[in-house]
Curated annotation (Swiss-Prot):
ATP binds at G67, P68, E69, S70, S71, G72, K73, T74. Keywords: ATP-binding, Cytoplasm, DNA damage, DNA recombination, DNA repair, DNA-binding, Nucleotide-binding, SOS response. Pfam families: RecA, RecA_C. This is Protein RecA. GO terms for cellular component: cytosol. Can catalyze the hydrolysis of ATP in the presence of single-stranded DNA, the ATP-dependent uptake of single-stranded DNA by duplex DNA, and the ATP-dependent hybridization of homologous single-stranded DNAs. It interacts with LexA causing its activation and leading to its autocatalytic cleavage. PANTHER family: MITOCHONDRIAL DNA REPAIR PROTEIN RECA HOMOLOG-RELATED, RECA. It is found in: Cytoplasm. GO terms for biological process: DNA recombination; DNA repair; SOS response. One of its GO terms (molecular function) is ATP hydrolysis activity. It comes from Sulfurovum sp. (strain NBC37-1). Belongs to the RecA family. InterPro entries: AAA+_ATPase, DNA_recomb/repair_RecA, P-loop_NTPase, RecA-like_C, RecA-like_N, RecA_ATP-bd, RecA_C_sf, RecA_monomer-monomer_interface.
Amino acid sequence: MAMDAQKQKALDMAIKQIDKTFGKGTLMRLGDKEFEPIAAISTGSLGLDMALGIGGIPQGRIVEVYGPESSGKTTLALQTIASAQKEGMVCAFIDAEHALDVVYAKNLGVDTDNLLVSQPDFGEQALDVLETLTRSGAVDLIIVDSVAALTPKSEIEGDMGDTHVGLQARLMSQALRKLTAILHKTNTTVIFINQIRMKIGTMGYGSPETTTGGNALKFYCSVRIDVRRIATLKQGESQIGNRVKAKVVKNKVAPPFRQAEFDIMFGEGISYIGELIDYGIKMDIVDKSGAWFSYGAEKLGQGKENAKLTLKENPKLREEIEMQVKEALGFGEALGMDQEEISSADQ
């Protein structure tokens, strides 16, 4: 709809005044600038990348990964770091829990020699480090593990039994207000790992679970991922890993509420090859007859673990199956598919 000359002149003058006061580009028409699709960092899980809708964690955004203990939250964060480092990105890990396992991180493919690590003494220090790294514009991905461990200084220095109502929530709210404006300019991605707590007095109405750190993080996040362990993987009598379900409960960059299931193997992390087999079966690329897995005329092995071992030892065959699976899913077309239909395969 055309604007009359007088209004147009007034608008142009207003834009010039705003640009002069706050800098060029402060106010613009969307049609004057070409916007590129949101770039993403792979999570290391094919299914979760699909569920997120853009092929991974969105760059330049705040993301929350939460769930019960030992559900795979830190593993997911470390796998994302490994993926980012392979793309030449600079990554940092703010270890507020002081529990980072360097050997495990190496096993997941993290370049620990070039990973920036901070183990802060209290919450304010952790968030100051986070803000400084973000403002520098030199760090692409920062993990904060975890929100629950961001204890305010006054609580640490106080006596046992002292009450500190809402201190951590106020701290998080202030930090997130400052961070949001910076992230857009520096394109830094921040992933907060969070724990869940039980609400008191829900009386059966609504979910009894909530996350720590107040409500601010829920609002400022572009993506929230709920990670749950749903089964234990066994080989004979030995436990070798967990089957995990990740549900995207909030997504500002794609449709939400999609979910994915994948295996996390003890000491190895997310089983990408296991996902290839699962998706291969769903897409009729890999055949499963009884306990036997095969690809065309090639026998992959009896049992999923043997099939995974065959593909691990034969990179050429693995790449061939991977190419066909990705082509069958096709990250443009498949991002709109129902994740519940393709997220889990026959065991």
